[in-house]
Structures are given as C-alpha cells and as structure tokens.
C-alpha cells in the first residue's frame, strides 16, 4: 500500500514526519537482516545441508555511541572524456540515520527511488527539494531495487524469509526459496537484484553467488562469483555484470535467462571492492567501490575513477535528463546508533540508459 505521508528531509540533518517515528524506524531491532535475527538458527537447523558459518560483520558492535560521526569529505573529481567534465562537485541531497538508503533507481519524473534497510520501507526522493515520500512500508528489510523494461518493480528483501518481493504492478512475494528450501539455507546475505524484460530477476547473494528467478519464481544457481554484490544487465540484456570483490565478472545471458561463459570483465581500482553498479546510454559500466565510481567501457577497458565520499556503496543515474549520477553513502558504526547515510549527486556528461530505470 502506498503512503501519502511525506517525509520532509533536511539536506544535512535527520528530520522527518512519517508513518514511522525515527525513534522506532531507526532502532536496530526494528527491521533486522536475516543474519541479525535470533530466529535464524531455528530456520537453518531445518536445512537439508547446513549453510556455511557466516563470519562476523566488520565493524558490527563498535561505535556504541549515538553521536553522529563527521560526514565524509566530498572530493572533487578530475575530468574523464565523455563521462564527466572538470570542475564538477558532489552535493548532498538527502541524509538520515541508521543503515538506510540502498538500491537507488531512477523514476521517470527525475526523482529517485531507494530502499531503507532499518526503516523497512521504500521512498521516493525529489533531489531538488529533499522531500521524500514513503511509497511502500513493511518491506522485511528491503535493500536493492530494480524496475524491468516492462515496468515491474522488484525489491531484494534481507530479513528472515526474504528474497525477491514484487512491489508493482501487484505486491507479492516473487521468490524466496531454492530447491524447496528458504534462501537462508544457501548461506550468505541477500544483496542486490536486477529484473529482465522476460519477467525474471537475477539476485546476488553475497557469500552464495548468483541466482536467477524465472518468470514463475523458480530459482537456479550459478557458481563462480561467491562474493557477488552489485548486479546489472547490459542495455541489450545479453550480458550480466556482477561485482565480485576486487573484480567485475560477466556472464552471457541466453533467451531462457540461463547464464554461461563466466569471465573476468575488469579489475576495480579504487576503494574497498565492488558494490552497486549502473550503466549509461553508451554501455559504459559504473561501479561503486566504497570511495569512488570506477568506469569501464563496454569492452572492459578501465576509463577512470570518479572519486566520491568515503562509504559510497551504490550508484544510479537520475534527474530529468538522466545526466546526474547519484551515490549512496554509509558511514559511522555499522549496526550501531552512530550509523548514518547520505545520498549525493554530481552532474555528468554521460547520460544514463533510458530503456530501464537503472
């Protein structure tokens, strides 16, 4: 159900009037990821094969105070021919508390949709005013968003029993099992997704690899990218790009959605490994690395890095002409009251691919 309540979000502060009060919406126990949920052990105890033990999340349990840490600096990028002109600057267009702001995608009116993990909702942001409307609530710790060429909207849900939820044209669970068992049985963490034009969805589960849910929601698994994180299709949907640690890998995509020919596409140069990705109208690939957006040609040639704020873990094209690159930024102590997030934006020469939201 869509909410007509509007969150008035100040550009550099946390202030809102929403269906969820900040005291509850950003409480660490409000919307848990599966690995944080005390009920996880009961679910995995019923798996036919126990999933691998999950390592502790770096930074979890630190920075116990709730005081906001200093916001990361906004570096000034150099020019990259055809991509970004010299003299452009990042600006903050949204900021709030918690482990929020993930999976950004463009809307046709120039706004940005994004998911809030801790708050468990999906919001629509007008970057010009900082006003954000809650579109969907109760998302079971929603993360990545994707809209197919046909207009269907999907969300990667990271809570216990999560997987792929369809939000539009009707809201329903699309896929959350593999070979008859919950996705918790494969191990890892649901991370990102991309929807194709045939009605299926590719899902990256960090620690488990790449999965494809066909139009009926039946899932197949593809090995070779155990650290799968960001995931995006090429313009013609014949290539699937997946960030896998310090590299980007690619698969050939077949008419039935199956994947073959896993190969290394490019090595990342900046930051802490690859995360969310986007493509532009010329087929270039942009990958968030934790401190930059690394840019590659369609052939896999490294074209340069657009340095961004420390903690930038996802990118998307948006704006009325789709020539603005938006970045999502996390800083502070992960899983603690000091956690903070931002959405930042910078104008580019390049234009995002118009045939899909991302």
Where are the model-predicted features located?
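C-terminal, active-site-flanking charged/polar segments
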Residues: 17
């Amino acid at each position: 159900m869509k909410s007509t309540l509007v969150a008035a979000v100040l550009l550099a502060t946390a202030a809102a009037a929403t269906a969820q009060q900040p005291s509850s919406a950003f409480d660490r126990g409000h919307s848990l990821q599966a690995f944080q949920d005390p009920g996880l052990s009961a679910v995995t105890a019923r798996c036919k094969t126990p999933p691998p033990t999950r390592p502790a999340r770096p930074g979890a349990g630190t920075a116990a105070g709730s005081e906001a840490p200093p916001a990361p600096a906004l570096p000034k990028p150099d020019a990259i021919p055809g991509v970004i002109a010299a003299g452009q600057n990042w600006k903050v267009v949204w900021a709030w508390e918690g482990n929020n702001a993930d999976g950004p995608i463009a809307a046709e009116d120039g706004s940005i949709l994004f998911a809030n993990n801790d708050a468990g909702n999906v919001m629509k942001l007008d970057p010009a005013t900082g006003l954000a409307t809650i579109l969907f609530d109760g998302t079971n710790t929603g993360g990545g968003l994707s809209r197919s060429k046909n207009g269907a909207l999907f969300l990667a849900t990271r809570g216990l029993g999560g997987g792929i939820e369809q939000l539009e044209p009707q809201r329903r669970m699309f896929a959350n099992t593999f070979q008859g068992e919950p996705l918790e049985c494969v191990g890892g963490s649901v991370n990102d997704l991309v929807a194709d034009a045939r009605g299926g969805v590719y899902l990256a589960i960090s620690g488990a690899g790449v999965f494809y849910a066909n139009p009926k929601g039946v899932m197949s698994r593809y090995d070779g990218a155990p650290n799968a994180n960001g995931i995006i299709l090429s313009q013609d949907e014949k290539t699937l790009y997946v960030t896998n640690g310090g590299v980007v890998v690619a698969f050939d995509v077949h008419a039935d959605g199956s994947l073959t020919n896993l190969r290394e596409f490019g090595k990342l140069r900046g930051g802490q490994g690859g995360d969310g990705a986007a493509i532009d109208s010329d087929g270039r690939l942009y990958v968030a690395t934790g401190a930059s957006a690394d840019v590659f040609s369609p052939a896999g040639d490294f074209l340069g890095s657009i340095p961004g704020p420390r903690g930038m873990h996802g990118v998307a094209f948006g704006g009325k002409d789709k020539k603005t690159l938006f970045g999502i930024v996390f800083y502070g102590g992960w899983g603690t009251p000091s956690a903070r997030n931002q959405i930042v934006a910078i104008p580019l020469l390049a234009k995002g691919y118009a045939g899909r939201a991302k």
